Each structure stands twice: as C-alpha cells, then as structure tokens.
Amino acid sequence: MSAFTPASEVLLRHSDDFEQSRILFAGDLQDDLPARFECAASRAYTQQFHHWQALSRQMGDNVRFSLVAQASDVADCDTLIYYWPKNKPEAQFQLMNILSLMSVGSDVFVVGENRSGVRSAEPMLADYAPLNKVDSARRCGLYHGRLEKQPQFSLESWWAEYNIDGLTIKTLPGVFSRDGLDVGSQLLLSTLTPHTKGKVLDVGCGAGVLSAALASHSPKVRLTLCDVSAPAVEASRATLAANGLEGEVFASNVFSEVKGRFDMIISNPPFHDGMQTSLDAAQTLIRGAVRHLNSGGELRIVANAFLPYPKILDETFGFHEVIAQTGRFKVYRTVMTRQAKK
C-alpha cells in the first residue's frame, strides 16, 4: 500500500474537518490512508486478510481482521469512514454490523467510486443515518450523515445456502458466487476425478464448494482451504461441517500462512481486488506453488481464457496443458518436475 486510491484522495480534500475526530475506517481499504490520516485517533476494521496485513505494519493492534466487528473495534470512535465495496450485500452486512455498535450521533461518511454503486448507500442507510452528498470528484462520491438509530444485527440472519449434487453450500455476503456455483468453478469441478488421494490445498476457497465436491467422491483426500476473506473462511468451515467433511480452513494471503507441501493445489483465483483488476494473487499462486507442491504434485486452476496465465505457468513450471475449456474459461494443469523454478 502506498499510492492513494481516488476515494482516499476525495477524503483528503476534507482532511481539515477530521482533525478532532476519532475515526473507525472500514470497508474496502485499498491503501494506507487509515494509518496516515491526521485525526485525534484512528482504528481500522476489515474482513480482508491482506488489507489487515498491510495496515497492521503501521497501525499494530489498532487494526483488526474478523468476520464481524466488535464493540472494542468501535471503542471511543465518534466517526465512521466507510469505503464502499463493489458488492452491495457485503456493504449492507458490514454497515449494519458496524452501525449497530456505534453511538447514536456518530458521524457517518461513505466514500466510493461511482461505478461501484456507492449511490446505493443513500437508500440503504435512509432509516439509520440519512446521507447527503458532500463532494464529487475523481469519479467518486462522498456522503455524510449522522447516526439517528442503531440497526439490529444478528449474524445468523445473514447466512444463506444452496445445493449442488447433494451437497449443501453455506454462504455469506461478500463470498464469491454467493448465489450459486459459478461457471468457472463448474468447469474445474468437471475435471476432478473420483478416488483422488493425498493432501489437497484449495487456495481462494470461497464457500468451499471445490473442496466439498472433491471430498464427496474422494474420501481419502486431506483438505486444506484458505482465503483472504473472513466471510469465505467461515463459509467454508460451515460448508464442510454441513456435509460431514473434515479439513483445515484459515485466512491466508495466497500462501502467506500456508505451511508444508501438497499433492495437489486447486484454485479459481481472483483477478479483481475491489474495483481494480489485479493479477497479483494469481501470479503469486503460480510462482509460489513450486514451494508448496510435492514432487509430481499438480497445480490445477481455472481462469478466464483471456488472462495471460499460460506464459506464467510455462516460465515457472516449464510447461502447461489445457484440460478443459469453454468459450470463456480454461482449466490449466501443470506438474511439479525437476524443471520447475524453485
């Protein structure tokens, strides 16, 4: 994190107004403004492990990563600055959670890019903190209101589920493919053969659908699942439990918290981080896989056909093959051999 996002640049136009504020930063925290903003006190709360990693280097215990905010995250804060994400249900989940903890009378600021749908904040918060638009610049909107009524928030009411091939998939707002199995994952699933054995790592596990489907027809696999998203980690745990499956699930920025080597790594890697296109996670996945695959171990990923993954696969492993494809997606497979660049 270094350069400020357009949303942060809009906030900086009003920096003098915040000098006496005790601020909680939350939402899509794509830069380190929470650590550098001049104010009376600054805290940050995030559901994204990689955002917590970056901010904790400067903010220490004043930034926290978890599924839901707690009273301690809001302690003494009189102002919320919320960065609007591209996912509206995710925004609603987070705002209802945070505002249920903040004191009536607190200042509420919502900032985000117009293309992210930040305008939806006005009707969403109309009953709790009626918003007015106070600035428009850098293709972003900045809204302000005061908390008039705390919303009710119960985590249980936000869970959803769907069924696929006899499996129950548990989901939460902010989890990839929350409303059903996406086409890319479906294509990757079609390539997983029954009676797979060994240790399997599912990177960017989402709701845990890939691992659950694999384990349902390959009961001897030993599953490890990870994701940067706190809702995804909790959803994957719930999916495994709902189907009587076992596996280790934890938060990790690709391989940052992963220990050991595996016989197979599977992934439907993201190529967006918030509103921005980013291949960083997928490149880290491919290049880092050589340090986490056993000899003869396999990396199998699905991706949009236009993304430049074949080049990275060949540079890292020496070869790749396409084992399934549609007009939009391809499933790539490569194997850990002596020619892989460790």
From Swiss-Prot:
Q: What is its main location?
A: cytoplasm
Q: Could you say which enzyme class this protein belongs to? A: transferase
Q: Which domain of life is it from?
A: Bacteria
The record's catalysed reaction(s) read: guanosine(1207) in 16S rRNA + S-adenosyl-L-methionine = N(2)-methylguanosine(1207) in 16S rRNA + S-adenosyl-L-homocysteine + H(+)
Record CDD domains: AdoMet_MTases
Q: Does the keyword Methyltransferase apply?
A: yes
InterPro entries xrefs: DNA_methylase_N6_adenine_CS (IPR002052), Mtase_sm_N (IPR013675), rRNA_ssu_MeTfrase_C (IPR023543), RsmC/RlmG (IPR046977), SAM-dependent_MTases_sf (IPR029063), Small_mtfrase_dom (IPR007848)
Q: Which SUPFAM superfamilies did the record assign?
A: S-adenosyl-L-methionine-dependent methyltransferases
EC number(s)?
A: 2.1.1.172
Q: Which UniProt keywords apply?
A: Cytoplasm, Methyltransferase, rRNA processing, S-adenosyl-L-methionine, Transferase
One GO cellular component term, please give it.
cytoplasm
**Record-linked Pfam families:** MTS (PF05175), MTS_N (PF08468)
Gene3D superfamilies the UniProt entry points to: Vaccinia Virus protein VP39
Query: Which family does this protein fall into?
Result: Belongs to the methyltransferase superfamily. RsmC family.
> What does the function comment of this entry state?
Specifically methylates the guanine in position 1207 of 16S rRNA in the 30S particle.
Quaternary structure (record)? Monomer.
Q: What is this protein called?
A: Ribosomal RNA small subunit methyltransferase C
Source organism: Salmonella paratyphi A (strain AKU_12601)
Taxonomically, what lineage is the organism?
Bacteria, Pseudomonadati, Pseudomonadota, Gammaproteobacteria, Enterobacterales
